[in-house]
From Swiss-Prot:
Gene3D superfamilies, per database record: Immunoglobulins
Keywords assigned: Early protein, Host-virus interaction, Secreted, Signal, Viral immunoevasion
Keyword Secreted: yes
Function: Soluble IL18-binding protein that may modulate the host antiviral response.
Coiled coil: none
Protein name per the record: Interleukin-18-binding protein
The family this protein is said to belong to: Belongs to the orthopoxvirus OPG022 family.
Native source species: Vaccinia virus (strain Western Reserve)
Family matches, as InterPro entries: Ig-like_fold, Orthopox_IL18-bd
Cell compartment(s), UniProt: Secreted
Secretion signal, residue range per the UniProt entry: 1-20
Gene name tied to this protein: OPG022
One Pfam family recorded for the sequence: Pox_vIL-18BP
Length: 126
């Protein structure tokens, strides 16, 4: 009896995602304005298991990319904002660069991790 319950439960959890109509989600998009980068991406399935964040890589050094919170003054990222439109959840995260001289040789990468995989998009100040 427990096995039947488990099978029925798993079918109920997975069936809506397997048999759902294909929903189109655009790739990551970055919009720039004075001193900020706005990264937007959408999630088709299980948005609670998705995460959006920014990385920064100093192109003059051999160091790996770093999370924004490890870079100190002159840069910060807002909390991720999510909006729901039907069955699509759109995530958005804004990166604020106030010290453009300090970060003029950096590459910034917006990363969206979902159950479908990882999407990345790069942008530079100059």
């Amino acid at each position: 009896m427990r096995i039947l319950f488990l099978i029925a439960f798993m079918y109920g959890c997975v069936h809506p995602y397997v048999n759902a109509d294909e929903i189109k989600c655009p790739n990551l998009n970055i919009v720039t304005s004075s001193g900020e980068f706005r990264c937007t991406g959408c999630v088709k399935f299980m948005p609670n298991f998705s995460y959006m964040y920014w990385l920064a890589k100093d192109m003059r050094s051999d160091e790996d990319a770093k999370f924004i919170e490890h870079l100190g003054e002159g840069i910060k990222e807002d909390e991720t904002v999510s909006t729901i439109d039907g069955r699509i959840v759109t995530l958005q995260k804004v990166l604020h660069v106030t010290d453009t001289n300090k970060f003029d040789n950096y590459r910034f990468t917006c990363v969206l991790t979902t159950i479908d995989g990882v999407s990345k998009k790069n942008i530079w100040l100059k």
